[in-house]
From Swiss-Prot:
The encoding gene: pgi
Coiled coil ranges: none
UniProt-listed SUPFAM superfamilies: SIS domain
UniProt protein name: Glucose-6-phosphate isomerase
Organism placement in taxonomy: Bacteria, Bacillati, Mycoplasmatota, Mycoplasmoidales, Metamycoplasmataceae
Top-rank taxon: Bacteria
Active site: E282, H303, K418
Length: 429
């Protein structure tokens, strides 16, 4: 898979002056004696992250579900427990709608009673299975949703059958969800202890929903393996993941930019952007440091944010993911009855015009708007490319956080709202 990185800014950047720091942090990421080794399972790829026996078991389970006309899987999880899988599905399949294909629905990622009610109403006419994903089982959003939905499934088909359609992805060492799964004889998939939620899509956390949707997981793994090898050097000039990390750091530290906007030109990348926001937001946003991760979809958001980006305050830079080959394309035909200027575009395709919009917008924002732009060009939106891109960003994120001087693998600030909510509810977490 080809990934190109191009910087579009008048700012002069000195990368080589940071090579010694990069070497130090590269060793910290890759050394088996690293002080962070208990959080680096995602980087020990595929040896730690991939369990071939578990994937084979998942394949058999999915095949059995499909043979029994169970064509809807409800994935219950929040944060890294669902964002990676949702990002992968949309990235690889597009947004549909799809007919006569397995459907994956995501719940447990909010406390909206309306959303939960409406999706349960939809499920009343469906044969569905449940995959609840939580390392501990004590996170309130998925815990509540699982309790309600599992009882709903029992009411629909009975407890005995409901147990055969409920799958638990959790820690195999301890936790409330593990105890529930064991006491109710539910199928268990492992959440690997050394892989944090936001780094977990390339593991059992992401694979079961993807297999259910008939995604080629082997190609995702292959793309990630290739990226892991490609970005295994500490050389800034040869490692684009580290070059991206250093670009971000310099924008923040040397030029006082406070926000990075990840921009895509395809709506099916909305949830990839959301996954990226969690990855960098939770990894870097601590000790009063870090770039604020924002996102936009162009050309849609040019009609809402375009004015601000062009002429507003200059406290942000843009990283653009551009996909060279679209999934599908449509030609524009001339309509004689339409005496409009659009007729002059007949003979072109929609993707050609989207590409020209990308070129024009990048030029306008970088040259006239004085916003630094970093362009990541990827070949396509295949499973292999998805795996590659995930590994690219995960490696870049770890390096970026180390450059910033923060721990990439904890998220202590998240506990504050959880603790206050528990107090409000009189709930012992």
């Amino acid at each position: 898979m080809s990934l190109k990185l191009e910087v579009k800014t008048e700012i002069k950047l000195d990368y080589q002056g940071f090579q010694n720091q990069i070497n130090e942090f590269h060793n910290r990421i890759n050394d088996k004696n690293s002080p962070d080794i208990n959080f680096l399972g995602w980087n020990n790829f595929p040896e730690v992250a991939i369990n071939p026996q578990e994937i084979a078991r998942m394949r058999k389970i999915v095949e059995n579900l499909h043979q029994n006309s169970i064509n809807v899987l409800v994935v219950i999880g929040i944060g890294g427990s669902y964002l990676g899988a949702k990002a992968a599905l949309d990235f690889i399949l597009g947004l549909g709608p799809f007919e006569n294909k397995p459907e994956v629905i995501f719940l447990g990622n909010s406390l909206s009673s309306t959303d939960l009610y409406q999706k349960i109403e939809y499920l009343k006419t469906k044969n569905f299975a449940i995959n609840v994903i939580s390392k501990s089982g004590s996170t309130i959003e998925p815990a509540i949703t699982f309790q309600i939905l599992y009882q709903f499934l029992i009411d629909q088909i009975g407890e005995k059958l409901a147990k055969t359609r409920t799958f638990v992805t959790t820690s195999i060492k301890s936790g409330e969800l593990l105890e529930i799964a064991k006491s109710n004889e539910l199928e268990i998939f492992e959440v690997i202890e050394s892989i944090g939620g936001r780094f977990s899509v390339l593991s059992s956390v992401g694979f079961f929903p993807l297999l259910f949707a008939k995604i080629n997981v082997d190609e995702i793994i292959q793309g990630a393996i290739e990226a892991h090898k490609r970005y295994s050097t500490s050389s800034i000039s040869q490692n684009l993941a580290y070059k991206y990390a250093l670009f971000r750091f310099l924008m923040y530290k040397n030029f006082n930019y406070k926000t990075e906007i990840l921009i895509s030109y395809e709506p099916f990348l909305i949830y990839f952007n959301e996954w990226w926001k969690q990855l960098f937001g939770e990894s870097e946003g601590k000790n009063l440091k870090g770039l604020f991760p924002a996102s936009a979809i162009f050309t849609t958001d040019l009609h809402s944010l375009g004015q601000f980006i062009q002429d507003g305050s200059k406290n942000f830079f843009q990283t653009i993911i551009y996909i060279k080959k679209p999934k599908f394309d449509l030609g524009i035909k001339k309509i004689v009855q339409f005496n409009t200027k659009i007729n002059k575009l007949s003979g072109k395709t929609v993707s050609e015009i989207n590409f020209q919009a990308f070129l024009a917008t990048t030029l306008a924002h970088s040259s006239y708007g004085n916003n630094p732009n970093l362009v990541l060009e990827i070949a396509d939106s295949s499973p292999k490319t998805f795996g590659h891109l995930v590994m690219f960003f995960e490696k870049a994120c770890a390096m970026s956080a180390y450059l910033l001087g923060v721990n990439p693998f904890d998220q202590p600030g998240v506990e504050s709202y959880k603790n206050e909510l528990a107090k409000n509810l009189g709930w012992d977490r």
